[in-house]
């Protein structure tokens, strides 16, 4: 079976071609600021990115012959985890999405390209809006603001399944805490195959991260909103985009920050240690959801490469459960394996409604 995987990100479009579970081509098509600045809205980049995918396949002599095309899922309405076939309802919701992100282009490009091939199907898998929260986890102190989830569902679930396979068991039989350490940070409580509690890692909950603010003091945030000093869009960027490490230290580059610390930068040390402290505190809070009965804590994402971060996290959390580290992320493989499982009948294909 031949699969095409498409993963649009903020500044790049990653593609991969798989023959069954073997990658035959993996490419990261980078987009310059000048290229993207010519588009008023992210959704307007659709044709541009689609054509780049086709050109990359042609440049590498890859025949345009696929059994399915799987795209990164976008910011749809909340849905359970799993594999979904792209349909008209999904496309309509993406075209009118309340939140914008390059990931919204994944299902659009997959659907458009699949339509060119007889019998080819278009899928998404485990988008960031996967919502399997226990009802008790949704309730906040204000009925106006129930909790929502936007998190690294694809990578968290892939790492959880990988851990299960390594330990000769099933994801659906485990109680895990999975922490994705990237530009955003999500801490998920996985109970028997479902993420029953997880923070909104995009715009306003959990630990602060390289570019996101995490949970903020509500009263001060209201005062700032009403101060007249910032527009709505400016404030949103101060919550997600120009927040966290980059707001404090002017960079999201953790290795560079660690070098500053080694050179005696006490402010950099205080800020990075504060982020680690907040991550550990969130993991500790997550342990309560499972009554302390945790099979393992899994740390993944780009920052899991940092010995500085991982060593200090382990000091604070290793008393809770065994800690396993899976640096980086492989969303391309996760998407491919989900699509392959759907084609083989090993995973159910769900209908988006």
Q: Where in this protein do the model-derived segments appear?
A:
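Short glycine-rich, Thr/Ser-proximal phosphate-binding strand/loop in the N-terminal lobe
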Residues: 3-44
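Phosphate/pyrophosphate-binding loops at sites that engage ATP/ADP/AMP, CoA/4′-phosphopantetheine
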Residues: 53-67, 165-169, 283-295
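Short beta-strand-loop/turn "lid" adjacent to the catalytic site in phosphate-handling enzymes
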Residues: 57-102, 121, 129-141
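General beta-strand structural signal in soluble alpha/beta enzymes
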Residues: 68-71, 121-127, 177-179, 197-198, ...
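Glycine-rich phosphate-binding loop plus the immediately following alpha-helix
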Residues: 105-112, 139-175, 183-184, 192, ...
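Adenine-nucleotide phosphate-binding core of ATP-dependent small-molecule kinases
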Residues: 237-291
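Glycine-rich phosphate-binding loops at beta-strand->alpha-helix junctions
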Residues: 294-313
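Conserved phosphate-binding/catalytic loops in two-lobed NTP-binding clefts
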Residues: 307, 311-337
């Amino acid at each position: 079976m031949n699969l095409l995987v498409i993963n649009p990100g903020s500044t790049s479009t990653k593609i991969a071609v798989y023959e069954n579970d073997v990658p035959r081509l993996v490419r990261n098509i980078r987009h310059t600021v000048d290229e993207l600045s010519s588009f008023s809205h992210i959704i307007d980049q659709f044709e541009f990115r689609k054509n780049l995918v086709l050109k990359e396949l042609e440049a590498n002599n890859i025949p345009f012959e696929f059994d399915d095309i799987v795209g990164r899922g976008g910011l749809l309405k909340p849905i359970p985890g799993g594999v979904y076939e792209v349909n008209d309802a999904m496309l309509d919701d993406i075209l009118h999405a309340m939140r914008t992100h390059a990931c919204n282009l994944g299902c659009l490009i997959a659907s458009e390209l699949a339509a060119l091939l007889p019998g080819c199907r278009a899928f998404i898998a485990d988008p960031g809006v996967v919502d399997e929260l226990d009802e008790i986890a949704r309730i906040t102190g204000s009925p106006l603001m129930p909790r929502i989830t936007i998190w690294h569902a694809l990578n968290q679930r892939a790492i959880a399944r990988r851990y299960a396979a390594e330990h000769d068991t099933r994801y659906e039989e485990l109680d895990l805490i999975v922490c994705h350490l990237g530009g955003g940070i999500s801490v998920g409580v996985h109970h028997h195959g479902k993420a029953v509690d997880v923070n909104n890692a995009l715009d306003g909950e959990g630990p602060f991260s390289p570019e996101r603010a995490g949970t903020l003091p509500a009263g001060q945030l209201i005062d700032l909103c009403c101060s007249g000093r910032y527009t709505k869009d400016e404030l949103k960027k101060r919550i997600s985009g120009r927040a966290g490490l980059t707001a404090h230290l002017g960079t999201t580059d953790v290795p560079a920050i660690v070098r500053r610390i080694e050179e005696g930068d006490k402010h950099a040390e205080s800020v990075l240690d504060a982020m680690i402290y907040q991550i550990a505190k969130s993991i500790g809070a997550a342990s309560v959801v499972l009554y302390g009965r945790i099979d393992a804590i899994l740390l993944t994402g780009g920052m899991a490469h940092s010995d500085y971060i991982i060593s200090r996290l382990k000091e604070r959390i290793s008393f809770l459960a065994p800690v396993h580290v899976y640096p980086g992320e492989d969303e391309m493989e996760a998407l491919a394996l989900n699509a392959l499982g759907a084609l083989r009948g090993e995973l159910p294909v769900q209908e988006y409604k």
